[in-house]
Swiss-Prot record:
Zn(2+) 2 binds at residues 219, 254, 352. This is Vacuolar membrane protease. Zn(2+) 1 binds at residues 207, 219, 279. Its EC number is 3.4.-.-. The keyword Secreted does not apply. The chain crosses the membrane at residues 12-32, 427-447, 483-503, 512-532, 546-566, 574-594, 709-729, 746-766, 774-794. Residues 616-666 are annotated as: Disordered. It is an enzyme of class 3 (hydrolase).
Amino acid sequence: MRFQNPFAFRPGPVSFWTTVIYLALVIPLIYVHETVPPAPSDRSLYQGLNLTEAWLDLQTISRAFHPYNSHENDVVRQFLIDRTKEILDRNSMPYTTETIGGVDWHTRNAFVQTQDSDLNPRDEFIQSRPRGATLFDDKISNVTWTYNTARPTGTNIAKGTWMGQYFEGNNYYVYIHGKDDPEGEWWRSESAYKKFRGQGGVLVNCHFDSVSTGYGATDDGMSCVSMLQLLSYFTLQGRQPKNGIVLLFNNAEEDGLLGARAFGYSPLLHFTHTFVNLEGAGAGGRAILFRTTDLQAAKVYAKSPHPFGSVVAANAFERGVIKSATDYEIFADIFGQRGMDIAFYAPRARYHTNQDDTRHTSVNSIWHMLSAALASTERFSQITGTTFHGDRSDGKSDLVQNGKKAEGVWFDIFGSAWAVFALRGLFAWSLTLLVATPLILVAITYILARKDKYYFFSRDIKMHHDINDDPVVLGGWKGFLRFPFALVFAGALTIASTLLLAKFNPLIIYSSPYAVWSMTLSIFYFSFWLIMRGASFIRPSALHRGYVLIWLFALGWGLQVVGAVAEDRLHIAALYATVFLQSAVFLALFISLLEQFALLGKHDFAMQLHDAHQARDISSHGTDHESRPQPEEEPAQPEGDEDESEDATETTPLRANEPGYGSSTRTSFAATYRRSVADNAPSPPRMRRYQPYEHEQSWSGRLPSWTWIIQFLLLAPVPVILFGNLGLVAMSALQMTGTDGGSLLVPVLTLGIVSIFLLLPLTPFIHRVSHHVPMFLLCVFAGTFIYNLVAFPFSDSHRFKFYFQQVVDLDNGTDTVSIVGLERFSRSVIKSLPSASSQDIKCEKAVGRDLMECLYDSSSLSPHLVEGKTPRELITFETVDGTNASKGRLRIDALDSRLCYLHTSRPIYGFAVDGGAARDPRFGGFPSEGFKTIQLWRRDRDRPWTVNLYLDEHSQQADKSFEGEHKKLGDGSVVHRRADDPLEVTVRCAWSDANKPGTIPALDELLKYMPTWAAVTKKNVGLVEVRKTYKV
């Protein structure tokens, strides 16, 4: 039995190798995506690290809800303080405690900029500062600012509602002294600030508050316990960092990144040149590198043992595609620091719910974050030179001078390797693909054409100029139009299936994303194979594979134009995967062109074929009888004539059965001439036969049959890895955004588009795949399509998330519960509640969200927020001395609450809280038209707010910072307020502590009676709001 080439371009090998290679790529991708690397045992960890200890700390932190506006928050804060002291004592690390805060960096910056810049940053340094730490217990810093709700971290122009905000922070942070840091309490010296615009230190940040409906195990307890382990590691003997490290445990992140803003008043602000922000936007799983500020920071992350992330996420944040906010925005965009955002990101169904607990996460997840944080922090603390020191790229002198940054591209490979390079390098690569590769292909084409071996787009060849002479058919255009037709057909079916799914059951991706993947991949594979295999069966072509590669190259070239513009003009690196795909397509097409060097020249082939036919005809006539044939007689036909038994091919003359065109009927002259030649010439030798595949062009027999596997290995692995990884991350990031008010179409459509890109590397070879694979996938499509259309989208492990708030309006005497979510499922939740089952529920569009708000009466479940107090007794409001026509001076208090809102009946043009800082322009601009809402926070529940409201646009008593900003933005018009025009102020105070059963009976009822496939989270900062309007 003859041995068959296992890599021949035949249905068996092609079906086997393409399937095996795709499975070998996809299965590890899914495994890496769905699992977390196992944590090492405590004995094998670096000295100073202990995962058992970290897990116990996490259980302690997440034992109860601990939002900023709760008593449990104070318990967690004290626990962190006690644990840091315990760790320092255990490691015999000397430490001191500071209560400094509230540094006015605007005044200090002005001072620094006027100082002599010739000072040597090392003047007061000693050779090596001894080990030590300083604990900063900041109960001083407070922040006042105005901002637009459309751009909470913006500076000037935005659409939305303008608000004022006042926050009193209570951050806690530990400064681990570095070897190169100056001696003493340098943060108390003005000149020391100047020096620390040198090398600087590293800021590592977490927030220890949770939302009011979540225990905060992943968001953000795991980050905080990781930082406790970093403290243990870096304070051991012999582990002192070169540059100092600041471990910041900030508070009230969940309420608007408030703790990070308060750190803007820390004396260590300009000391920290770099940062590592640890966050949790999911519940367990792997910690992804959400984003970095630059290429150099991405290179620092490369030290992580299990890197995970992509620059696509960073671009999505920059362009507003991902709307989640983290402290990264404050550190990078406002303070000007350089660093990274490492965060858990899935599953969002548990995010901000009561399943964000230790039961739904693992030690492995702690280790994944801890190992990345440790590697990045250690590397940041070791870097010297100008990498993170020196003049800034943007030239802003008021921000930390941490060097010039470069834009980068980064991504992981199977969660084990980290690729990082400059964006300019990617742009250069794109330009090379746009310019050099077409020239190379043109050059090869020219050489082939000169050698008469370029069979693409070839026309038929006429051997003689006789008008009656039929040409030799080469079939050079066969297969040219198949790819665009198949791509449009298969792509349309794939997109149509996602659109149909988005119309009837879009949320199925919430719980069954792999069923959606299976549907989109199988329909594209089958429909593309159907067209290509059918076309190949009807009109076989050896140029089929090459033409597909030409089309892929042309499409990729157009996509590279878009990519190059995005990279150069928009500074977007998210299209990096297309560069790898286009490079692979170019190399595969290059091989297809090189294959044609193995062929005969087109005219040589035509001549050889022509001569072979003539010789065969002459040989056959030479064996005829020697009698002289008459013109009207038909010559005898030799037995076994191959022309009678062979089927017609593209090389058979079109008039083969006519006299003089290959038929056995000849003219008398021709017969006499051929017979005479046969009589005097020996029989010609038999031409060597190169058999083409099936009925493809006869010249193609010389083409090598094994080069396809090289092309496939170039085309498939790298693009499939890159697009597959991006698709899986996009799946996890987007699949549960529908219940948050996100688009219901985008998640399923994204999977459809990624499926097409995943299978593009297979398209040049799919016509040789046997029917077994596509028919199996057709069955897969049928099953998954039906399942996706009819299955219920939620389950106990993938719960429908909705938003809750109870509002007690003392003016109207109403007590209502607001349920915000997708209306169909929100109504199902409300119907399950005894108190609301008989009510007529009204739903309307929710403010600020693409969701519906459903209200029901909850007067039978009135909240018990303060023991022995009714809602009417919770808020105190009074006007104090100093109130006049241009200024209102108010005192507000709320029992056992840290938060109240003020909403005025007419615009105000400034506000100030007694004892508070002036407005900070770093956190937002100021509207010329004024604003009507103020949010007030306090750290001490027993101390009321005394607020000054500036009512006149040009009030001389107005805060200077407000007045100056207004003069810059205003139109100069004067607004005169009548003394008898009363100002109405609506006070809304919030309560968020739901740890004690019975405090919020309406929430207790929800948790008890709602379906198991539903999960409740907070609608606003407060679970309960009490409202009352007062006249000033």
